[in-house]
Amino acid sequence: MSNASDHVDVLIIGAGPAGLTTANSFNGSNCRVRLIDWKPAPLETGRADGLKSISLEVLDSFGIGDRVLNDCQPCEEIVLWNPGKDGVIARTMTIPDKVEELGQIERVMVENLYRHKTVQVNWNTQPVRLHIAPVTKDEPEAHPLTITVQNKETLGQETIRAKYVVGADGAHSWLRKYLNIGFSGDVTDSTWGVMNLVPKTDFPDIRKVFVVHSRAGTVMGVPREDKLVRLYISMDGGNRHTSIDAKSITAENLLQAARAILAPYRLDAARIPWWSAYCVGQRVADEFARHNRIFLAGDAVHTHSPKAGQGMNTSIQDGYNIGWKLRYCLEQKASPALLSTYQTERRPIAQALIDFDRKYLESFTRRDITHQEFLEAYLAGQRFTTGIQIQYPPSLIVTAKHLHAPSHPLATNLAPGKRLPDFQMVNQSDAVPIQAYHRFTSDGRFRLLVFPGDISQALAFGRFSRLGDWLTSHLPPSSGLEIITIHGARRADVELMDLHPAFRPWSDEEGWNYWTVYADDDSYHKGHGHVYERCGISKEDGVLVLLRPDGYISLIASFDETHELIDFFDGLQSGPRTVPQPERRANL
């Protein structure tokens, strides 16, 4: 008979970006979570590049955004080199760029797990068997998944019983193969090498993001921390249809290929901490979930060329998506139908990623590409990897009202299914400015953002106070909903204690909460956030925005449509009243 200590709510397999993001989503919860990985320790130097703003916002919500940034190498421009008529490469284009190149993100995320002590982390551990017991939807406390894991050093085995399993175990996922889930797609005829090196070179743009097309092939360079540069090197000698066995490639082969492409500039390596070679695979898993109990994320469900940071950023979003949903189901006893939205939301994104990657890879391998074509491909890549164009389809957690309109009439720059943009707001109590995603910590809660307008005006203040009465009677603190007010008045014209207590809740242990009311106003040292303007909200009408724990918008309503909040949370507990829509392609 298993011990209680062998029972967990969630077992996460794999400590890469997807698995670590999923694990960090449980920090501060009472959930029993274990994370296992076959590696002996977290990677000291990450193997992914290009942290985008949307991923930084996720890390901000974990409280580690600033720490990750401290380890990053900021990049401000990308340069393109092409051969001239004489065949000699020359700089032909410079594009402003803004991206943070990663250093030790995985180490920082693991340290955050250790600090919170919510998730148990086991290294040198891999799964060897899985048994799935039959279970009905009426057994939320069941542990139907029995996983046998093995320590790689001692060969000792342990049996774990779990409610849910998340497989974030990479492109060669043990869990995906064990479940016999198809991995549709193909391996291209494009062979590339990748290496981290400390370069000794006279190439003038070595500390910028650069792409060099020459008659000998293509190389992309990305500056990193500690004097390192990441090079992506085409290994086909400029012939895109040459088949090369990646397993036969050595580090010296990579260096020789890079030298040929960068000629007449010289290139040597002071040291090479890491390198690899691969044939580009572009695949998407046929299923992202099985039985609503087992979920796959990250490279376990999508593989592609690693040249735009899209893989790591997409993997972080996968982990963030399934992490909050599992936590919400476990803590709030929500309908299991919530978990079904993971596949309907994330698989279309993965397919769009592969479709995009095919075009993006073409822009890096074509030597005859024009400046305009490369610029268009690059800008398309920026739009994709930032995630700002993603709009999730209607579901249990995205209301269909106004979904297909370009925006909501009361918030013309917001829409259900899209992510709330980050912005600066000023704390009403202490005048300290803060970015939204620094404040919106990852704690598994929905947030009702109340934009009451200019509450220094009697009409807006009265409407705001009536909303407070309604919230007190219909959505008490026990609902688990956090209410955040962002008003449009001058901060000096508002007194916190004049506001309805629903917006500054009282705790017998800690007194008033001074971190729930903010002003869209000038700060003393960091300017004005212009929140209402950026979101397209009228200070006369105001609006209510229901925000999911992952920062995407569930619902937008007027102050006269508060019943929609009741309907939303009723549905979240009982499940959808209609047949779910079939999966569709992502709206990007």
From Swiss-Prot:
Disulphide bridges in this chain? none
Q: What induces it?
A: Expression is positively regulated by the fumisoquins biosynthesis specific transcription factor fsqA.
Q: Does the keyword Oxidoreductase apply?
A: yes
Q: Null-mutant phenotype, please?
A: Leads to complete abolishment of isoquinoline alkaloid production but accumulates a series of benzyl pyrroles, including fumipyrrole.
Question: Which E.C. number(s) belong to this protein?
Answer: 1.14.13.-
GO MF terms, alphabetically ordered: FAD binding; oxidoreductase activity; oxidoreductase activity, acting on paired donors, with incorporation or reduction of molecular oxygen, NAD(P)H as one donor, and incorporation of one atom of oxygen
Recorded hits in Pfam families, A to Z, give: FAD_binding_3, Phe_hydrox_dim
What Gene3D superfamilies does the database record attribute to this sequence? Answer: 3.40.30.20, D-Amino Acid Oxidase, subunit A, domain 2, FAD/NAD(P)-binding domain
Residues reported to bind FAD: 9-39, 45-50, 232, 289-299, 309-313
Which co-factors does it depend on? Answer: FAD
Q: Which pathway is this protein engaged in?
A: Secondary metabolite biosynthesis
How does this protein assemble? Homodimer.
Which family does this protein fall into?
A: Belongs to the PheA/TfdB FAD monooxygenase family.
Q: What does this protein do?
A: Phenol 2-monooxygenase; part of the gene cluster that mediates the biosynthesis of the isoquinoline alkaloids fumisoquin A, fumisoquin B and fumisoquin C; as well as small amounts of fumipyrrole as a shunt metabolite. The products of the cluster lead to a brown coloration and are important for growth and conidiation. The nonribosomal peptide synthetase-like protein fsqF, which lacks a canonical condensation domain, is required for addition of a serine-derived dehydroalanine moiety to activated tyrosine but is not essential for the subsequent steps leading to isoquinoline formation.
Name listed for the protein in its UniProt record: Phenol 2-monooxygenase fsqG
List the top taxonomic levels of the source.
Answer: Eukaryota, Fungi, Dikarya, Ascomycota, Pezizomycotina
Q: Which gene encodes it?
A: fsqG
